[in-house]
Amino acid sequence: YTDETKSATTNDYGAAQRVIYGTATPKYFGSFNNTFRYRGFALDLQFYFSMGNYVRDAWGTYAYDGFNPTSNKYKRNLERWQKPGQITDVPRYEYGLQNFSSQFSTRLLYKGDFIRLRNITLSYSLPRKVLQKAGLGVTTFYVRGFNLLTKTFDDRLTFDPENGITSTSNLNIPINKTVTFGLTVEL
């Protein structure tokens, strides 16, 4: 497009105006926790959310056009424009293209809204009667998961939306999903 009205298109990269679409800084973020208890069981949940910002796929500059033809490309390149009349938002691949046509493209800009199950713990504490006979204090078995579920609200987003202050992904390693098992015994 030539400007923010999106009323005209151009093939001349220099003829397009730069437009501010949003901010990398979330408008809202926070977390909420809850614990549910029933008899000896406890379920602890912590959710974290971030809303109202955009994230940019910096690596997409290299992975979508033909700038670096020998490097790995995104699977979405299979949806690229290939013949007249085809409708797609992935441009034609030009082998050896050197103009960084994707550098400041909105194709690489995504809504960064997400909610993540940051921590979930399911535990069971043995009854006190059993423990007193064994001479033990509180004994709890648990299984804990970290970052097991992330819901994003932009269907095109293929990377972890939780990233640094610039909200730019550059092949960053996503936050690990971790599951631990444990036993806590008080003597």
What are these regions (language model features)?
Residues Y38-F41, L136-V138, N176-T178:
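Strand-connecting loop/turn motifs
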Residues Y1-N11, Y64-R76, F159-S169:
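Surface-exposed loop/turn segments flanking beta-strands in extracellular/periplasmic regions
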Residues L45, F141-V143, L183:
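Membrane-embedded beta-strand positions of outer-membrane beta-barrel proteins
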Residues Y1-Q46, D89-L131:
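Outer-membrane beta-barrel transmembrane strand signature
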Residues S50-T140, G145, T158:
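Extracytoplasmic gating/loop element in the C-terminal half of outer-membrane beta-barrel translocons
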Residues R37, Y48-S50, R144-L148, E186:
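Outer-membrane beta-barrel pore domains and translocons
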Residues K73, L78-G85, F100-S102, T150-L187:
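C-terminal beta-signal and terminal closure region of outer-membrane beta-barrel proteins
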